[in-house]
From Swiss-Prot:
Classification via SUPFAM superfamilies: SGNH hydrolase
Keywords of the record: Glycoprotein, Hydrolase, Lipid degradation, Lipid metabolism, Secreted, Signal
Protein name: GDSL esterase/lipase At5g14450
Domain of life (superkingdom): Eukaryota
Predominant localisation class: secreted
PANTHER family assigned: GDSL-LIKE LIPASE_ACYLHYDROLASE, ZINC FINGER FYVE DOMAIN CONTAINING PROTEIN
Species this protein is from: Arabidopsis thaliana (Mouse-ear cress)
């Protein structure tokens, strides 16, 4: 009797184990048979973290030594080389994005970049000449996209030159394109300058709702795949330390970053993720990926040596000593001696390029940590981001 009972238990256990293996095989097979997403184009919206020449085309061109590493010349990027959006294009086998505002040498066959340095999600009552805030807020970038989409359709039917038509997007490919967002940091920076902490925190839901409206706009025009970056730990930007003096106890965290600013960034990210989850329910045909660049960037602050970096708070380009500050690419006098704010000898070891923006090496780390799905929700690589989870 006892032996029969034991045999029965073994049979049940074996059946359950076999069933679990079958389910695992079915899930694995289901995932493996999904073909890699083929994105014909990328349309990007953002700020200087992903601007490939927009603000430089609209205002004063970015000068040397920006771009010295990879491109060997300034290209309108706030870095010594490539940005995360460039690594996204590489991963998808697409050319680097031309800035929408760049009128010369642009090719929009495989997408366009509407991002500009200093952009915010919400419109700000400031000018770029005051605090560096771009006039091209997210709603303006979406309006530019609307116009771009409509005008490119018209031009495609009017232009007779095959060479010129090859620089225009195909209308049927807008629905298959990848739409990327990397914006929000400047909204928080402006808030810290103009509001109390409580006032700024109270504006976060509205800021995030403006971003959600942008996603809805593109969805209504046929866009289906969205790759949404959260905001980085802007309390770790070395510029925060330039004029700080001796910080009060508890002002900085263990990595030397401004705690209050990073806490606000995390609050923004919490609300953004919540909004992305709700958008998935609302936009039933959309595949929306939330991308945690905050963690990828903070890793470089907390474990720089492990990742191959030197002091992450040390600025690579520019001259910053005590009370003397000469920004990257500029000249100034220190003790009656002219100083050029040039590049450090080994940017690949640096995290911060100019005190505000990241080096190519840092941007590559962010790309490596996010494009494979390790820091995304849902946890899918960008090459499978077109599938709704």
């Amino acid at each position: 009797m006892k032996d029969n009972l034991e045999r029965a238990k073994l049979m049940v256990s074996s059946t359950v184990f076999s069933w679990l293996l079958l389910c695992l095989f079915a899930v694995t097979t289901s995932v493996s048979v999904q073909p890699t997403c083929t994105f014909p184009a990328i349309y990007n919206f953002g700020d200087s973290n992903s601007d490939t020449g927009g603000i430089s085309a609209a205002f004063e061109p970015i000068r040397d030594p920006y771009g010295q590493g990879f491109f060997h010349r300034p290209t309108g990027r706030d870095s010594d080389g490539r940005l995360t959006i460039d690594f996204i294009a590489e991963r998808l086998g697409l050319p680097y994005l031309s800035a929408y505002l760049n009128s010369l040498g642009s090719n929009f066959r495989h997408g366009a970049n509407f991002a500009t340095g200093g952009s915010t999600i919400r419109r700000q009552n400031e000018t770029i000449f005051q605090y560096g805030i771009s006039p091209f807020s997210l709603d303006m970038q979406i309006a530019q996209f609307d116009q771009f989409k409509a005008r490119s359709a018209l031009l495609f039917t009017q232009i007779k030159s095959r060479y010129d038509r090859e620089k225009l997007p195909r209308q049927e490919e807008f629905a298959k394109a990848l739409y990327t967002f990397d914006i929000g940091q400047n909204d928080l920076s402006v808030g810290f300058r103009t509001m109390s902490v409580d006032q700024l925190k109270a504006t976060i839901p509205d800021i995030v709702n403006h971003l959600a409206s942008a996603v809805r706009n593109i969805y209504q025009q046929g866009g289906r795949t969205f790759w949404v970056h959260n905001t980085g730990p802007f309390g770790c930007l070395p510029v925060n330390m330039f004029y700080m003096g001796t910080p009060a106890p508890g002002y900085l965290d263990k990595s030397g970053c401004v705690k209050a600013q990073n806490e606000m960034a995390m609050e923004f990210n919490r609300k953004l993720k919540e909004t992305v989850i709700n958008l998935r329910k609302e936009l039933t045909q959309a595949a929306i990926t939330y991308v945690d660049v905050y963690t990828a960037k903070y890793e470089m602050m907390s474990n720089p040596k492990k990742l191959g970096f030197a002091n992450p708070l040390k600025v690579c380009c520019g001259y910053h000593e005590k009370y003397d500050h000469i920004w990257c690419g500029n000249k100034g006098k220190v003790n009656n001696t002219e100083i050029y704010g040039g590049s450090c000898p080994n940017p690949v070891m640096a995290v911060s390029w100019d005190g505000v923006h990241y080096t190519e090496a840092a941007n590559k780390h962010v790309a490596d940590r996010t494009l494979n799905g390790l820091l995304t929700d849902p946890p899918v690589p960008i090459t499978r981001a077109c599938y709704r989870q």
